[in-house]
Amino acid sequence: MNPTNQNLSRRKLLKGGLASAIAWSTAPLFLSPRVLGRPGNIGPNSRINVGIVGNGLISKGHRGFCLTQPATQVVALCDVDSVILDAAMAEAKAKGVTCDAYADSRELCARPDIDAVFVTTPDHWHAAISIDAMRNGKDVYVEKPMTLTIEEGKAMRSAAERYGRIVQVGSQQRSNGSFRKAAELVLNGYIGKVDTIVCRLGEFPAPTQFAEEPVPATLDYDRWLGPTPWEPFNAARVKGDYGGGWRRFWEYGSRKNGDWGAHHFDIVQWALGMDDSGPTLFVPKGYEGEKFQYHTYANGPKVIRDGDSKGAMIRFIGDKGEILVGRDDKFETTPSNLKSLVLKSGDQQLYVSRDHRFDWIGAIKTRQQPICHVGIGHRTATICQLSGIAERLGRPVKWDPATEQIIDDPVASLMMDNPRRASYSLPI
């Protein structure tokens, strides 16, 4: 898009004709870097041209990072709400960055000069935009949870492999030294056999049927809903604050299982060495008097949501000790000397990342997998989604992590994906 026409294009798309303006294609739409006169891979000293789709609350940190880092050049911003988009554009301008504005992610993803895309939308858009970016030759940083459904996760994993793309999932606790140290101690047996793990997630308000309100002229509400069923507009439904908003609805998010579970369950997977597998049983709170939601692994550990975490985000309990870890510099061990223990040469040492976004940038340049790649993100999101399926059904769900199928439960199996409105199928 010509930068001088950016506002005109955006307003035209907001006013109408959006569904027919651009159709998903089944073929890659990008020109290779070689055709464009650029090397096949981005050089170690080259700037990465970035587009950001979704410019609300969660995007603010990513946008600020990309606008100020020498390694990245923001060339395009996208949002279905022109108020949010205008504010993001003003932020870029204030930092001396000139970029183009889009109301439709498909236009941004089709640009041949963009190398990588941040996907920081509500969860129900993660898969479609990420896959579209990948088939257009872009690497992707997608916020957690990676997808809204299990089948979307499989599709994203397949797309990354098919198109040879780098995907980093925003479960950034893997780039935190305290969480890595806790995971290494557990993985190497320093607290013995782990029987119980407690993860503190908290609760959102229950989903609510809000009264219908007029749709603001600045918002393309149909596109905000995207693949989900039509619902009357209410500002409380679409708001992106951490107190609930769209996150409290199953249609758009995974509630607290996907909000905080995507962080804490991810660290549990890492600590147990289960990045390519997962739990086998999911039990909801309230089933046969259960006080807490939990899931279990075939080899024994039980992961309890919101039990006694002793003030930590994650509490690992073994037969020889305990570890309490959180983001607020909380790192406590029993026995206490584990806190300063140095791993032995024969111990398994985990991937070290000092910064989640820099790790992604490095992976783009080296073409090596980042710390939380698409396969890891899919397995963690699967835990979030299966926990939600069990919660909604009010009964346990059994899972085969090898075949990635729900066992002997046709009703639960149908919930591995959601129906999509006809004009919003996955672009695969």
What are these regions (language model features)?
Residues V198-G243, M416-N418:
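Core domains of carbohydrate- and sulfate-ester-processing enzymes
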Residues A159-G164, K181-V194, E213-V215:
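Basic phosphate/pyrophosphate-binding loop/patch that engages nucleotide-derived ligands
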Residues D222-P301:
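Rossmann-like dinucleotide-binding domain that binds NAD(P)(H)
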Residues P122-D123, A127-S175, G189, G394:
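Beta-strand-loop-alpha-helix segment that lines the small-molecule cofactor/substrate pocket
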Residues G17-K95, Q173-N176, V268:
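N-terminal Rossmann-like dinucleotide-binding module
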Residues N2-I22:
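N-terminal secretory signal peptides and thylakoid transit peptides that target proteins
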Residues V117-F118:
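N-terminal Rossmann-like NAD(P) cofactor-binding module of classical short-chain dehydrogenase/reductase
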